[in-house]
């Protein structure tokens, strides 16, 4: 009788590649390069040790540095920062003009002007 089983594939160096579903006949062994043991989650590039039948934790995802920004990405970010700054300055200018208009109206209503 055949059975659908979830297995975990690793390459010749033991590095995890993917999980698969395979059909095994009763008594048939899992093919080389596959294991029934799930890798640890979360992990980046866990390695399976065939002798101990255990996965290593792999690389720590929190330690991995993001790739450096390209020149275009740096310029795009600088442009976005400048546009945000300009928008903030314009908003402050408009608020100042509104405040001045309100003060002049108050003075005119009070008969000072």
Curated annotation (Swiss-Prot):
Species of the source: Listeria innocua serovar 6a (strain ATCC BAA-680 / CLIP 11262)
- Top-level taxon in the UniProt lineage: Bacteria
Species classification: Bacteria, Bacillati, Bacillota, Bacilli, Bacillales
Name the UniProt record assigns to this protein:
Uncharacterized protein Lin0124/Lin2378/Lin2564
């Amino acid at each position: 009788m055949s059975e659908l089983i979830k297995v975990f594939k690793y390459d010749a160096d033991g590095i995890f590649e993917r999980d698969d579903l395979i059909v095994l006949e009763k008594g048939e062994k899992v093919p080389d390069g596959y294991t029934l043991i799930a890798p640890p989650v979360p992990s980046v590039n866990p390695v399976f040790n065939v002798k101990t039948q255990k996965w290593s934790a792999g690389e720590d995802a929190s330690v991995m540095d993001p790739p450096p920004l390209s020149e275009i990405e740096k310029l795009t970010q600088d442009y976005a920062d400048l546009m945000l700054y300009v928008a903030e300055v314009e908003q402050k200018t408009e608020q100042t003009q509104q405040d001045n208009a309100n003060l002049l109206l108050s003075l005119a209503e009070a008969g000072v002007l």
